[in-house]
């Protein structure tokens, strides 16, 4: 034997980290003890079901671990005939399912891919960079699967953002600073790359002061025939594509696997990666080209671990030439090149004969592509630097993840002593038993208006519009549901919905993504909290118009550092067990997830966190929003007769049927704040009110309402007609339909003989107990008054002069030609081209290349030629050159000052009566 090289030690430290290899979730559980309680029998029954499933699947000889528990639900559902659309391949960077997409009235087979990602550690250290690369990393996972990412969601957790700065814990940034800068970072990256972030929610819980929760979830899609899945063979070449390599992010994977202490803020800053959204936008453009993706045998994105992981995972045997890795600057040694986590890089494995063609296609998209490795027959990973072999390890050893780890588990007893007959019953029992000071105070109040204002002013129920409006929700022109609905844009959407990214055609196919999680319930009972997270995420999609049969889940687990404490291990054990029971009960499987198991700071721990994300494919004609639509419509409450999973499923099926029948004008799933929270949020969007039915008393308004639905019916429908419809469809068993009242034009809520002024409630909701002071969005009365007094601008003059230019060039239809130049940082060229196509023009999208001086000269000449062959120049928006130096569009204007381009533009505008348009950066140019 020999002593290991330094680079080998650093690679093993990275490769075997909890972040990269889920070592906590794969730790072998040697014993599981359930503490004595009224719930012991139910928990033990859940464990017995898990063991039964293991036996049915032939997995009883596999190590018993959290990873097995987290993934076995989907395995079981697939075995019994569900989840048939799941794509199974060697590439598993993102969840991937086959879906049928309507393209111009014809079905096409596509892959829908989705992924959630956390950047808790880097965001806690450097909020802007950590949050921005959270989104960048999330995008690259489906992107490596060849999908075009078109939707993003952000769910975060913070401590007390009102805490005075002087009371901040030593070694910590103020919570308000983290929240603001993280929002700026995430939104900056999304806005630059051109990704619509249509659902944003921040959760507040005092225990997130231990370490922030920063989750990004994205959805992408690609036509299935454009994706090639093959195992790389000996002799295949690995290209490094995209950004160059620097020292940023070194140690990020290992740092993310550690708990924090008072020194972390000072010692971990270099572990935070530096995002470069315009570079990743180029990768998105390249991977959207079928002639590119059909060359790729296998792809992996550069995230944690850099070269050692991204390339190291592509094949069993690899010879990697670190000298070939493009560098941001000189001075990097072999170890740094091997484990740097510089962003916006992709590794692709190609057949040798395809390398030159791929590099040429990459250059067309202004991207560098460099051969850096060769696949070998021998299963060893070797890295060479400056003539020396600095890594030479066997695949078997690398894949071992180090010595096996073992732990004992003690599942804690629930805080209450209530009896439950099933997992579902337990989840509802825990929800009702949970003490909520806000709800308790509300229930003690005599005034309905005071109660509603107090409830809606709570920070976790209040409007977060000031935060949401920092994110671009419309880029890509595919958004179906805006973040806030109604004429007043105030009712929060329950899920994000967008059309699939079909180029050159029309589609009615949409995807949806929702989430569920309550940190207070999960802290009270992790088992019930996880179960209810799944239920809530599914209910939100049902209310939005999707069908449970088409739904899939992915989980985000985030827990304290478990150490060797059985009680600490019991929390994720209980949560993942609860989530498993929910999957089995509702027939919806989790086919992906991300675990982060280092949420501790000194003696502080994050709350037990299992966020459930639910996604589905559907048709735009079924999409339903929660805001009330019209006065005079009847409102019903669809619930279940008992807290059994079969009854909840029956309720889901009933709502799906009613939406499909076309009689639902608005639908909202119930919230922890009860009917009161649901009704107020539904009312504010259009400024409508509710007159409650005489059978509804005030106490019912504030009871938790998870899994239930408030529905506004179409004209002529009421509770009785709904019951008849459900009976005729055989869907009425165990479903409870209650008349809630009517929608009114008066902006007030009437219930139990009391009247609440919803304007007063809305004001409390928008103030959010001070949340508006952190994320303001409303203008002051003085500003509104000034805006209302601005005089109207009108123009009266001669008609536009007649067109005197030459005959229009192009096809026989005489359609005008449009050139759309794409500069580094532009991001709405697809939207612009589609708009011109709809108007009858013929657009040409041209990517400006600035990789070398010769490339700039060639781009200058080509753009000038295209302008002379066109009647319109359209400069798309975005963030060209990162809007630097000194503001927007400087790079674009500099390029247009080139003599050839200037002369072509002058000829277009002055000699040929052509047009020049711009949006965002393009308008500024």
Q: What is the predicted role of each segment?
A:
Residues 880-925:
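Cysteine-nucleophile active-site neighborhood
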Residues 1-881, 895-906:
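Glycine/proline-enriched, intrinsically flexible loops and inter-domain linkers
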